[in-house]
Amino acid sequence: MPMITITLPDGSRREFDAPVSVMQVAQSIGAGLAKATIAGQVDGQLVDASDLIEHDASLRIITAKDAEGVEIIRHSCAHLVGHAVKQLYPDVKMVIGPVIAEGFYYDIYSERPFTPEDMAAIEQRMQQLIAQDYDVIKKVTPRAEVIEVFAQRGEEYKLRLIEDMSDDITAMGLYYHQEYVDMCRGPHVPNTRFLKAFKLTRISGAYWRGDAKNEQLQRIYGTAWADKKQLDAYILRMEEADKRDHRKIGKAQDLFHLQEEAPGLVFWHPKGWSLWQVVEQYMRKVYRDSGYGEVRCPQILDVSLWQKSGHWDNYQDAMFFTESEKRTYAVKPMNCPGHVQVFNQGLHSYRDLPIRYGEFGACHRNEPSGALHGILRVRGFTQDDGHVFCLESQIEAEVTAFHQQALAVYTAFGFDDIQIKIALRPEKRLGDDATWDKAEAALRSALGVCGVEWQELPGEGAFYGPKIEYHLKDAIGRTWQLGTMQVDFMMPGRLGAEYVDEHSQKKHPVMLHRAIVGSMERFIGILIEHHAGAFPAWLAPVQVVVANITDAQAEYVDSVRKTLANQGFRVSADLRNEKIGYKIREHTLQRVPYLLVVGDREKENGAVAVRTRSGEDLGTMTVSAFIERLQAEQAA
């Protein structure tokens, strides 16, 4: 038998006279590497450390220092959850346990909901199992035998999952954690010693196949890392994120609430709506300064329009419907078809293009209830939506201009770490490959002109076109996807949008879909968490509170409030019969940027004592001097 040559990342080669496992190659290099080996990447494909290499191949040893290694640790921790749960609660049924961002979860069918006490017991059992330092054994098993294994164990959900698999899959990996067995593509860790840096984080409900009509499952979430240092850093980040939770701050500052009777829909309170209006007016100015005409389109449209647009075939599961007089209408999930209708009212010359429309468009999408999360993931939301109807030759200039607008907006709201990505054609899409090639090339060209680097995301574009995505990093290092710019060669033709070219021929324009903040609800939720409720003064729902020390200053306090309000500031007066120290503490906790304290001396001198929310005493100044200070701060 010819020798098998293994090529390592540094270009060095090792030869073996028989099929060799990843672990054996690692052992041939050194005992330290072998001990650290989690898996391997053979010719670009991740495999288990026990898998045999039977031909010449390139090999990269995967350890906990690699991103792939950490992901494998997380996946194996999900299996360890299964092992612990089945020992503690033998009657439950295991469903599925995937890796997610920074962690993992396992869905489990249980007759009763798990409690926090259950989660603590499961975590303790997992730690006990890890301490046993046992090997995780992989066995590639014929499909029929896999069915038999899970049938004997009464794991009906595993059997359903196997039933869903293609007939081409004739064998699969079974991973044994002692007496517990799970099926998976793998790879997994070779031993439980790699799983020490984990923590279970929460329990929630989920539905089989994500459908609320199906039975409810228990979902156990956890996180896992390469070592305790990384785990501790993550826990600190999560504790900080918990302090910044927009739901907690929203309640504490009386900004908004949600309730069961309206899942995924927001009740805005006066201060929250004030914050909304500041954001909206800022974005309205962006529309005006960028040459967008603001429009307003209907909330519901006959389904025939959604059939023409392509939403019916590609998006109807996420749409709400209603009926009237034997006609079916859809509540709009997107604003684009409405903007095409505005464009279609009248004849356009190529000289008129580009034509830009903007709308603070209220949309509704039928998100699964389990996916809803505060105001970050809702069913009813408003977008700073815009559409540009242009010539192909104008795409680059429009995308470049949008890029500059978007960066300026993000900077103004306090974000300066921005990553740019291009989401490419999805499997389910409109149009042919040539059209998609053209659209994707246009976005690459425009970003090239902007001189920025970007990452490409295959399969993540919208069904009607590729898109540029703007991903913003917040104050604690989390990344949020916000703005988008999409090139669409399809929808104008489907909805009859036309212009007359220089040869008097009717042509379909290119349609650019753009949003900078995206969902206003989500953006405000992100702002709350990014600033931890301590908004910059220009953005704060209440910029100034004027507080008296005794009733003798009440009239003067009210006159100061009116003076500030007349200058356009968002100001309130605190005339309660409370000690001034109490008032200061309360408004500081409310993150109000400025507190103006008024006693007899300030009243006599027509002045105010100025304090910031950080506790800094700026001293006594005239009301006009304070106004100048606040105006200068807002203009900065």
Swiss-Prot record:
This is Threonine--tRNA ligase. It comes from Xanthomonas campestris pv. campestris (strain ATCC 33913 / DSM 3586 / NCPPB 528 / LMG 568 / P 25). PROSITE patterns: AA_TRNA_LIGASE_II, TGS. Homodimer. Its main location: cytoplasm. Binds 1 zinc ion per subunit. It is an enzyme of class 6 (ligase). GO terms for molecular function: ATP binding; metal ion binding; threonine-tRNA ligase activity; tRNA binding.
